[in-house]
Curated annotation (Swiss-Prot):
This is Bifunctional protein HldE. It comes from the Bacteria. In the N-terminal section; belongs to the carbohydrate kinase PfkB family. In the C-terminal section; belongs to the cytidylyltransferase family. It comes from Hahella chejuensis (strain KCTC 2396). GO terms for biological process: ADP-L-glycero-beta-D-manno-heptose biosynthetic process. Residues 1-318 are annotated as: Ribokinase. InterPro entries: Bifunc_HldE (IPR023030), Carboh/pur_kinase_PfkB_CS (IPR002173), Cyt_trans-like (IPR004821), PfkB_dom (IPR011611), RfaE_dom_I (IPR011913), RfaE_dom_II (IPR011914), Ribokinase-like (IPR029056), Rossmann-like_a/b/a_fold (IPR014729). Residues 344-477 are annotated as: Cytidylyltransferase. It catalyses: D-glycero-beta-D-manno-heptose 7-phosphate + ATP = D-glycero-beta-D-manno-heptose 1,7-bisphosphate + ADP + H(+); D-glycero-beta-D-manno-heptose 1-phosphate + ATP + H(+) = ADP-D-glycero-beta-D-manno-heptose + diphosphate. Coiled coil: none annotated.
Length: 477
């Protein structure tokens, strides 16, 4: 399947469900408590992150889509923290505050990248009337491309049918991340996304692939769904639609570090992609790739559009690496259409050393994409002398293209990159070393079209020239 990334920035998604605050305490562990056989953690860092339905909204916003989050919280410090994080992420949050019940908070204590304990602070919101939340949702559906019901069984979605019927009456697709064994309450939804254990809790244990497909299709028919997506951990995910062949996608994760919030990522990417106009199979393929990214991160995390885009290109074996200027121009136009910021740097890069790697990592963090333009062999000889380059152009490009921080590598025949800057027009021009802006070649060009010029430090005591001289001296000895 050829996967296409949609224009996420053109979509708007409304999320309603059980919002939570994920709280992390990080610290060092070096001894066992004298009071009980448990480790003592010296807490060094505190962090709050949106969780539950709020994490779904955060994932949607990270992709570039407009996100709205609605749910029930307490009237407490945790609710204030959650609202502040929604605002800082550019998410419109409209919470129904309860006077006496607490905001659902999950506190995790982590040391040496391991979760030692989780403590939950919560009371069910099942007794809270839903009418106020329904009115809030109705007021936010105008212009929405999808509605997500993020059900964690905490009571905010006591009656999902009210939200499903409201959205479907406006021809807005409804995606449900379900909870519990009663899927009847999700009847009429566009898509539900149970994991395997949730699915089998409803249909019974499946002893074969054929049985899973058969029972899944029966569920699609009985609940009047358009589709059912069963997420199956290391076995990938399976999409089932009436009258269509099943679509099975293998798991993408190279290394599983933390599965916290992976289900949120799946439904977030699905909703944002469908809202942006993707076909269902395409949206599922994107969600599968995103899940593979997020389980490699620690804690409740999100996936950005550039991350997803790079992963798609790696999956399809295209879109990165060494390119001609003409090919690169097309790639940059496409990246800009997806709202990505382009960083550009240049140099000879004759012998790649630790200073180069650290510098390129810094440069990459300034934007979404990094272009490295290198001098041709003839250009290097003019600048460095007839004994250079040590490595020919093809080898220098191959090494740079293999670095994780580098998206694209190209070359130029001139002694300066000025003509290349006029063609590519990067957002940020970066140079390594202790330079003033006026000493960076091409700064007038970049600032002339509204770009930015930055100078970054190299790692101390790292120099290609010094390395070459040392090799020559060692040979003389």
């Amino acid at each position: 399947m050829q996967i296409q990334l949609p224009m996420f920035q053109n979509s708007r998604v409304v999320v309603v469900g059980d919002v939570m605050l994920d709280r992390y305490w990080y610290g060092a562990t070096s001894r066992i408590s004298p009071e009980a056989p448990v480790p003592v953690v010296k807490v060094e860092q505190l962090e709050d992150r949106p969780g539950g339905a709020a994490n779904v909204a955060l994932n949607i916003a990270a992709l570039g889509s407009a996100a709205v989050i609605l749910g029930v919280t307490g009237k407490d410090e945790a609710a204030q923290s959650l609202a502040a994080r929604m605002e800082s992420a550019g998410i419109l949050a409209d919470f129904q505050e309860h006077e006496t019940l607490p905001t659902i908070t999950k506190l995790r204590v982590i040391s040496r990248h391991q979760q030692l304990i989780r403590m939950d602070f919560e009371e069910s919101f099942a007794g809270v009337p839903q009418e106020q939340l329904e009115k809030k949702v109705a007021g936010q559906l105008a212009g929405a491309g999808a509605l997500v019901l993020s059900d964690y069984g905490k009571g905010a979605l006591r009656d999902p049918q009210a939200f499903i019927q409201l959205a479907r009456s406006k021809q807005i697709p409804v995606l449900v991340d379900p909870k519990g064994s009663d899927f009847e309450k999700y009847r009429g939804a566009t898509l539900i996304t149970p994991n395997l254990s949730e699915f089998e809790a409803v249909v019974g244990h499946c002893t074969s692939e054929a049985e899973l497909v058969q029972r899944g299709l029966k569920l699609v028919e009985e609940l009047e769904l358009e589709a059912l997506l069963v997420t199956r951990s290391e076995q990938g995910m399976t999409l089932l639609r009436a009258g269509r062949s099943e679509l099975h996608l293998p798991a993408q994760a190279k290394e599983v570090f933390d599965v916290t919030g992976a289900g949120d990522t799946v439904i977030s990417v699905l909703a944002a992609a469908l809202a942006a106009g993707s076909e269902m199979g395409q949206a599922v393929a994107l969600a599968n790739i995103a899940a593979g990214i997020v389980v490699g991160k620690l804690g409740t995390a999100s996936v950005s559009a550039p991350e997803l885009r790079r992963a798609v290109q790696q999956e399809q074996g295209a879109g990165r690496g060494a390119m001609t200027v003409e090919q690169l121009k097309v790639a940059l136009d496409d990246a800009r259409a997806h709202g990505e910021k382009i960083v550009f740097t240049n140099g000879c890069f004759d012998i790649i050393h630790a200073g180069h790697v650290g510098y390129l990592d810094q440069a990459r963090k300034l934007g979404d994409r990094l272009v490295v333009a290198i001098n041709s062999d003839a250009s290097v000889s003019r600048l460095k002398g007839p004994a250079r380059p040590i490595n020919p152009l093809e080898r220098r490009m191959a090494v740079l293209a293999g670095l994780e921080a580098v998206d694209w590598v190209t070359w130029y025949e001139d002694d300066t990159p000025e003509r290349l800057l006029e063609i590519l027009k990067p957002d940020i021009l970066v140079k390594g070393g202790d330079y003033s802006k006026e000493q960076v070649v091409g700064w007038e060009i970049v600032e002339g079209y509204g770009g930015e010029v930055r100078a970054l430090d190299f790692l101390d005591n790292c120099s290609t020239t010094a390395i070459v001289e040392k090799i020559r001296k060692d040979q003389v000895k």
